[in-house]
Regions:
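General small-molecule cofactor/ligand-binding pocket signal
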Residues: 83
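C-terminal alpha-helix
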Residues: 103-114
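Conserved alpha/beta-hydrolase "acid-adjacent" motif
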Residues: 37-40, 57, 62-68
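Active-site-adjacent alpha-helix of alpha/beta-hydrolase-fold enzymes
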Residues: 62-80
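Alpha/beta-hydrolase
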Residues: 1-44
Length: 115
């Protein structure tokens, strides 16, 4: 059974596992797969307000559909921010890491920094 059945997920987890977590095993419990199938955060996105929310969305995400992420942004109530990055789901952690981490840092400083 495969929990995240995309080529980029397989590449990310196997390559990252070798480099950063050499004892990691490519295994998942049936309960985790069951919980993953029930994971629908879009159903709760309106309840985040009035807390600020930032969505960093990959333009070509096949793991978490880009269209679904944009729909979530549209459903979210203000205050909300959206950034779209080039690439797929895992590029925010590698190829676009400088940009995604800067965006996240700036958002956190703006909303969680000293007042």
């Amino acid at each position: 059974m495969c929990a995240l059945p995309t080529a980029d997920a397989y590449e990310w987890f196997t390559e990252t596992g070798k480099k950063r977590a050499p004892t990691w095993k490519n295994e998942v419990t049936l309960r985790s797969v069951e919980y993953l199938s029930m994971y629908e955060p879009i159903n709760f996105i309106r309840s985040v307000s009035p807390k600020p929310i930032m969505l960093i969305v990959a333009q070509n995400d096949v793991l978490t559909s880009t269209d679904l992420a944009l729909e979530a942004y549209e459903r979210a109530l203000p205050p909300k921010e959206l950034e779209i990055l080039l690439g797929g789901h895992f590029d925010a952690y590698v190829r676009e890491f400088e940009k995604s981490s800067r965006i996240a840092r700036d958002f956190f400083l703006q909303h969680l920094g000293k007042k």
